[in-house]
A protein has these predicted regions:
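Long, contiguous binding/interaction regions
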Residues: 1-64
Length: 64
């Protein structure tokens, strides 16, 4: 399993997390946080390596 951390504006990260969950991935979300420069949250993904490689290759084909 691979684990990634994605940070960003709360709304954008939340939307991404929703899409990933609908695609069948395991997603854990942090509580929203605020620091001097931004407000956001983090999502943690537990991904199967084969699924990740397939997803990356499919996206590379879409965006040459």
């Amino acid at each position: 399993m691979l684990e990634f951390r994605i940070s960003g504006e709360t709304a954008k990260v939340g939307c991404l997390a929703d899409q990933l969950e609908r695609a069948g991935y395991v997603v854990r979300r942090s509580k929203p946080y605020r620091n001097r420069d931004e407000e956001g949250c983090r999502i943690y993904l537990e991904l199967d390596e084969d699924k990740v490689m397939g997803w990356m290759l499919a996206n590379l084909e879409k965006h040459p």
